[in-house]
Amino acid sequence: MDASGAATMAVLSSLLVFLALSSSLCSAGTLNARPAFPVQSGEIQPSGQNSKQAARRVMHPSFANAGRTPGLEIWRIENFEPVIYPKTNYGKFYTGDSFIVLNTIENKKDKKLSWDVHFWLGLETSTDEAGAAAILTVQLDDLLNGGPVQHREVQDHESQLFLSYFKNGIRYEQGGVGTGFKHVETNAQGETRLFQVKGKRNVRVRQVNLSVSSMNTGDCFILDAGSDIYVYVGSQAKRVEKLKAISAANQIRDQDHNGRARVQIVDDFSTDADKQHFFDVLGSGSADQVPDESTADEDSAFERTDAAAVSLYKVSDASGKLKVDIIGQKPLTQAMLDTRECFILDTGSGIFVWVGKGATQKEKTDAMAKAQEFLRTKKYPAWTQIHRIVEGSESAPFKQYFDTWRDAGMSHSRLIRSALGIGSDELLNDDEIDSVVTQLKKSGGRAFGFMPDHGQNVIETITQYVAKPGSDEIVVSTVPFDEKLPLLGFASYVLTYNYEANNGDTGSLTYVWHGVKASAAARKRAFEEGLVGSKDGLLVQTNQGHEPRHFYKIFKGKLLTSFTALPVTAQLFRIRGTVESDVHASEVAADSSSLASSDAFVLHSGKSHKIYIWNGLGASAFEKQAAVDRFSDYWDDVELEQVEEGAEPDEFWEELNGEGQYDRSLGDDGAPLLESRLFHCHLSSGGFLKVEEVAQYEQEDLDSDDIMLLDAGDEIYLWVGYGVSEEENGKLLDTAKLYFNLEPTARSFDTVSIIRVPQGKEPRVFKRMFPNWDDNYWQNQPSYEDMKQLVIDANNEV
């Protein structure tokens, strides 16, 4: 070993403790909400030249221009040194190597840069190379002044963020600089290789045994025979999988054969002779011997488990000795986090390490070590993800575990723009928006981002579904819209409405509304008929007390929901609203515990012809007046009396079972307003829901073959692609229910609105939650037949 190599090994030995810690840091994967580091495009601002940090900073020459411009940069570790990886090989990773991947993003508005740096470890990489990758990643992070988010990636367990960088997928090749294997030589003849293509949006291409037993009818396979590359399309493979397999084969042709190989596609349209030729080249089997679609259901998905076991631990060295103490379990609140400390959040399927800005250096350094100890104690797999979160840059996946969350200013740009009708090119005034959002969340209705229009049109039809007492027989009747006729809490309703947005966006909208006491049979019948009747329009299911703001708007401020058709005892209604058109009155239990100081209430006496307007100390002047306007002539021959909180007459309390405890807080935090997130959800063959988040999602991530779930907090959008079957479409609610059984927030299936959006019928509010939207996107995408023709054209040029 030369002097340089010996010196390198000495450094590695001295950093053995660091290596032990860094080797356990699993990739974050879903950290798609963080502030950009304040550096202008093309500029890296070093620390002061006299600082101790600057004095100890070391920069490898290969990193000299790293992170200066947007885009992807990759280095392969060779003899413990970072070597720039050719762009033509991006996406190809060797099982015996380690790599460093840097992704630089430029904010389109202020031109500031932010970074994600990943070190990728092949399953056969050496310990020394893995250590060098970890150390060099820290060096690269230091060069960028600590700005990057760091991720550790392990072969077969990469984060969705990492996979998203490689649109043609990533391919695992045997070999490596530090192993006994040899990298495949370009255009090598005689070495036949079989690859399995797994996944759809984010694809992994794995080399498998050269045998028909390695195949199945549900996937696509690539057979690289040197001058010919065959794409075998499984009979059960979907359209997107076919397109991705062709793209992966083209990449193998270009990377491994300098574009000089021919790509041959073998599918259901191929002749029997062409199919058999494929298996002759493979060396075994026939089309009839290909195993059925795999039941392992391993297509690049993760399953959320044990959400109820979420726990928060504090990492402290206040006593001079580092210790970890549990401080809370679900429900968690933001107030539990102390800026002077470090915390570990155990979600049951991953670990977050939250570092407060005022934490000691020892706590910051040792927090990850304690997380590693925690993994061993819990006997979690070695590749379990660990996410390191710094105060102020919390991601949506982290914030979802807390019942309430308040950011300093608004970082939820997609949701806020959608809710308030702010264009993507308009700047946000945080103070003004904070005030509007707070008021909307309290009084303007749930899902205030869902506003297809302003509710100015009339409701077309209202159909009521009521179960006969003592049976599941459903009485269906059409009811007129009348401001004195309430929606009844023991019934379900289907309402139809045609929306017209100011931008010309039009469409049909069907609401399925369930009262809190509606029978299961009534709910089922109403949804089934609403689903059939809505055809290609929007379909929204919502529950009493959790209606979207738009639902209130179509009632023009006259919505009243009641438990009973005719009052026989005292009735208590809560009045909320922000403007005349969204005022709504909701019946609550006639008990003093139902009162809240932040609201106005109307009590209809069961003992006298009197209506009490109760004004809570925190109720807005608008809501107090709205209560008077709404109920002054609602009942005939009644006396109206206004009562201020704290000055109630005895007869008022008698109607409410006596004066008792109630919510006297003047604020209403409500559910956290989280950044919207996109998921692909599907049921496995075993009946389990598989959930795959799409990191930094775009319109192109919506898969026409599937149902995509866009979680926007109070509303869940179920986007239904063109290729979804009638059977799958009929199981929309099952998908949503299972999703809520697994996701960790305090929300439930009954407290959110479920919105079905057919492909091609997306309303403006849905489109605004994407960075960019092109109405002609899918029409301009190449079909499977188009891709096959392009392959033929390319073959003719070889």
Curated annotation (Swiss-Prot):
Residues 1-28 form the signal peptide. Residues 451-792 are annotated as: Actin-binding, Ca-sensitive. One of its GO terms (biological process) is barbed-end actin filament capping. SUPFAM superfamilies: Actin depolymerizing proteins. It holds the Pfam family Gelsolin. GO terms for molecular function: actin filament binding; metal ion binding; phosphatidylinositol-4,5-bisphosphate binding. It comes from the Eukaryota. Residues 128-131 are annotated as: Actin-actin interfilament contact point. Binds to actin and to fibronectin. Belongs to the villin/gelsolin family. This is Gelsolin. It comes from Drosophila melanogaster (Fruit fly). The gene is Gel.
